[in-house]
UniProtKB/Swiss-Prot annotation:
Sequence similarity: Belongs to the RNA polymerase beta chain family.
Main enzyme class: transferase
Name listed for the protein in its UniProt record: DNA-directed RNA polymerase subunit beta
InterPro entries linked to this entry: DNA-dir_RNA_pol_bsu_ext_1_sf (IPR042107), DNA-dir_RNA_pol_bsu_external_1 (IPR019462), DNA-dir_RNA_pol_su2 (IPR015712), DNA-dir_RNAP_su2_dom (IPR007120), DNA-dir_RNAP_su2_hyb_sf (IPR037033), RNA_pol_bsu_bac (IPR010243), RNA_pol_bsu_CS (IPR007121), RNA_pol_bsu_protrusion (IPR007644)
Record flagged with keyword Transit peptide: no
CC terms in the record's Gene Ontology section: DNA-directed RNA polymerase complex
The protein's Enzyme Commission number: 2.7.7.6
Catalytic activity: RNA(n) + a ribonucleoside 5'-triphosphate = RNA(n+1) + diphosphate
Organism from which the protein derives: Flavobacterium johnsoniae (strain ATCC 17061 / DSM 2064 / JCM 8514 / BCRC 14874 / CCUG 350202 / NBRC 14942 / NCIMB 11054 / UW101)
Keyword Nucleotidyltransferase: yes
Amino acid sequence: MITNQTERLNFASTKNIPDYPDFLDVQVKSFKDFFQLETKSDERGNEGLYNTFMENFPITDTRNNFVLEFLDYFVDPPRYTIQECIERGLTYSVPLKARLKLYCTDPEHEDFETIVQDVYLGTIPYMTPSGTFVINGAECVVVSQLHRSPGVFFGQSFHANGTKLYSARVIPFKGSWIEFSTDINSVMYAYIDRKKKLPVTTLFRAIGFERDKDILEIFDLAEEIKVSKTGIKKYIGRRLAARVLNTWHEDFVDEDTGEVVSIERNEIILDRDTIIDKDNVEEIIDSNVKSILLHKEDNNQADYAIIHNTLQKDPTNSEKEAVEHIYRQLRNAEPPDEETARGIIDKLFFSDQRYNLGEVGRYRMNKKLDLDIPMDKQVLTKEDIITIVKYLIELINSKAEIDDIDHLSNRRVRTVGEQLSQQFGVGLARMARTIRERMNVRDNEVFTPIDLINAKTLSSVINSFFGTNQLSQFMDQTNPLAEITHKRRLSALGPGGLSRERAGFEVRDVHYTHYGRLCPIETPEGPNIGLISSLGVYAKVNGMGFIETPYRKVTDGVVDLESAPIYLSAEEEEGKMIAQANIEMDASGKITASNVIAREEGDFPVVEPSSVHYTDVAPNQIASISASLIPFLEHDDANRALMGSNMMRQAVPLIRPEAPIVGTGLERQVASDSRVLINAEGHGTVEYVDANIITIKYDRTEDERMVSFDADEKTYNLIKFRKTNQGTSINLKPIVRRGDRVVPGQVLSEGYATQNGELALGRNLKVAFMPWKGYNFEDAIVISEKVVRDDIFTSIHVDDYSLEVRDTKLGNEELTNDIPNVSEEATKDLDENGMIRIGAEVKPGDILIGKITPKGESDPTPEEKLLRAIFGDKAGDVKDASLKASPSLHGVVLDKKLFARAVKDKRKRTQDKDALGALEMEFETKFVELKDRLVEKLFLIVNGKTSQGVMNDLGEEVLPKGKKYTQKMLYAVEDFAHLSKGQWVADDATNKMVNDLIHNYKIKLNDLQGALRREKFTITVGDELPSGILKLAKIYIAKKRKLKVGDKMAGRHGNKGIVARIVRHEDMPFLEDGTPVDIVLNPLGVPSRMNIGQIYETVLGWAGMNLGRKFATPIFDGASLDEINALTDEANVPRFGHTYLYDGGTGERFAQKATVGVIYMLKLGHMVDDKMHARSIGPYSLITQQPLGGKAQFGGQRFGEMEVWALEAYGASSTLREILTVKSDDVIGRAKTYEAIVKGETMPEPGLPESFNVLMHELKGLGLDLRLEE
């Protein structure tokens, strides 16, 4: 039999809804594309890690004698499993190695041979299959960043006098920013790196448009007139467009070098914009200039007035002057020579070493400016600069529009892969610098690539990224939804992004391009609102980092239902008419409605079907996963929906979770994509099941058995009470039985907020909306004792407590159960290592781990000397440093672990040597067995066939072409792991089998080698622990938390409240048939909050409970009122849930009908046990001597100035004096008070508070001579 999955009655009217993409694709795919490990080295694309290496290599020394070239990179398998890393507090990482080639180009070093070496570059954190990283034992997520895309942006601002100022900003991927902007005098300036401004014409001169003539010709503003005595007179009255210059060369002798240097001199004869008259004509003719430039007499002169104004402000006349002027502005110094000055511009914008627009920047630039520059040209070109200036002039003349920087075509996503690429770039650039330095130092020595490279350089950059970067975050692991949402989050904060303080309203607001890409609902409520958002359910990030969403193509009013949906970015969607997913259409996809409401950018016109270009693929396309899990979301106010989607992430996994009766149909996908559950990999039969393991025997064909080295049975280990980051627990249990048949993808386990393969964050409860004796005033909740008694909202929380054993100056610390001055009763549960036994009940103050630390030696007293003389041993030279249970800890010891480094003494070394020898022999035996099996299987496949010439990785022929395969010939092959994938025999089917067999052999061999390496390491080193730590003891304690007064609960519609009273079951209001309700909510919490979805859910839930059915009501396409009424009638439930209730205390009927039904409630992570706290005596602050604050410090309550005023107002002087002295920082007074209470004496007089002394010291620090006198 096959265990049947929950079938839900789906109310969706939209048909042909495509499957959701893998929800973790945004993390997993990005990381895969970055590392490209599954791609052959010669087929790797120019992206990710490969691209970063190619950008930084080859590296040469300063004389270009030695060259270090990059050939390839690869990684070794990780040393520890993911779980071992979490337990030991290590990073789950892989060793990265690069194959480098060092050769010499200098003929003098003929003896230097070319060296190819594999060099270790450090360990790199590696992504787990569920899209997380384990850093120092904690699971982390690298959040994708939404930042401004590289390219050119045109904007406007307003001067204080109201003038509009326009600007164009070029943002590169790497390099200096350049900005062009206008001022109130209509002059255009260029700013480089936001430093000093220079007229844009100076920049033109510097990039090769040297003369005024060249600049004016760019914009077609001038005509050139040949100077002749007769011809020039007809131009009297026209205006000069450029200066008339007299140019000559002067020779002078350089005093330093003695060389004769020629210098160009310019004399201005007539300035720009001079109107030619008779006198000017003579000057022009006398100056011997060949031609002059005049303004063109046409209409577009006015548009380009800004260029003429800028030329007037331009202090330079030639390219040389321009580059020198720019050098002076940027460097605040005189240029040493013209070459250096010219080099600064080339380096800034035209050198691919310093400047890079990136593929995205070039694409955006070409698109915006309508250019056709090749995509691989990723530096600025002259054409770019000219076109930007032209566009800016169009903008000034209202012939073009400014950019909307919040449009998603101007914002792109930097996924994990790209962020890592950037960090690797930084690390490799640092490494390249040190390599260059080492090459220069070791000029005449023989050296190898290993000598040049310091592995720490790269790993320190990567580790600091994971450890300190704002986007590398401690994963929210409260429940599977919290995990999946965290991995799909997009943040506008972080390095290179916005800051909370500077982000305005526009950036945070919902934009029309967010449709289907970013969720308009799910965002935090605090200062980060709108800056952190979530991907839509169907959204994908394309290769350039832009978010795409799918649509179905519409041609002449017919929707294409057959083809796969087309993914469009925000830019591609511009100007398209897009209809909703649930428009009326027939089976062939023809739109039947005469008019449809469509969406075009930010408008919603009603159009004919023939005008529609695309339709949405699904009604929930607009929302994120969390928002899509709220049934009847369309009936809720957006603010409450936001709270609902945020609170579902805080739901604590319960002992017995239950999937909602009223769901949205997305629950199964979330549970499976969270990667927590175990799924069957194929068709098979369950062989064995218990609480810890499930064994399945898979059906296999003969061919599959032939190419595999694994048995048909596969055993899956179930996770038992594993601690999550937030202290909730993952505990899986099987849902299949022995003998069951399974199909591919079938869920085999449940738990961790899932039931039967569906997300199950809470429980379905019978609810009544009515006031109950004032206990549910202001969102409070009244709940039945039955809910607590039946463990409906009971959850298990796991905490781990660890203690490190260090090597101190006075000697080693020690774990032991023999602790000085502690009773036998206190140590009865400790083992010989001082660790508490599994199953022991823990209460505050209990010893969890016993540890003693050597005490500092002081001169012994005569008594101590006598004791030592009698007993021999140093009595009491150790102190108790045990770990004790904190004040609020009640629980049961779930597990304990002890990690220790290997001890290095002579006996241990001998034992290690024997153990390593045995390991090697065992490996050798297994390896020979594996190779024998491979040869047997290979021979069965290729028996009687002829070799096609099999090569190894080095290109050598291992199995000669034309020879018939024999067993002896196959046994002779030494290394099957390094055979290249190729043609073994003539037919393809056999070749595929052989290649699959060798592929599986390599996997098996890798596993064997990895196990050998791990076991060797364990024997020689022991457990890997941070430096200075000899042992690490860990205790896991489970706490069972029942629902209590003060716990926070919520529904899925933003309806949250605190449990105010747990009422006896028999006192709860009951229905006509005598059934008491489980929970009573305040009806006044509904109308003002406008979240009517909870009422729809309540009524439909009651019908579902009575009928024993579950429903899927997708958002924006859910059950209508008529459908709900039909079901309530069928279930014999009153319409709208209106029914009379009876008082549980008196049995009398209440006067009014109330809404009754079944609602899905969650218990949130804000539990009263974590917040309740009381203190009598405890730790004090060192300087002020006042009690510390907060539960974590076992602190007190701050009695602030307002509280003091309150007591003053009551005239409670004695209470006030007590609070400000003995209860706070009167050190002597509080000790005396404690003594008086213990002895039962009268309270002493308070003394002087320590804070008064602090004030005195501060005043003395100001140089005031302060003395207290009686």
